[in-house]
Amino acid sequence: MVRKKANHSRPGMNAAKAQGKDAGLTSQFHAEIGQEPLNQAQRQNNKKRKKNQ
């Protein structure tokens, strides 16, 4: 059975220009978050998530 396409979706809705300034992965916020080291609890959770993928 094929799923029906949603009526409310608009073409280009997920485009970067529709999500505001610095919304993508190259934003300054994303670059700052990536530099912080993980604490022990976050590291353990990360291992579990990678294992489940």
From Swiss-Prot:
The keyword Secreted does not apply. Keywords: Sporulation. Induction: Expressed only in the forespore compartment of sporulating cells. It is found in: Spore core. Residues 1-53 are annotated as: Disordered. InterPro entries: SASP_SspO. GO terms for cellular component: endospore-forming forespore. It comes from the Bacteria. Belongs to the SspO family. This is Small, acid-soluble spore protein O. It comes from Halalkalibacterium halodurans (strain ATCC BAA-125 / DSM 18197 / FERM 7344 / JCM 9153 / C-125).
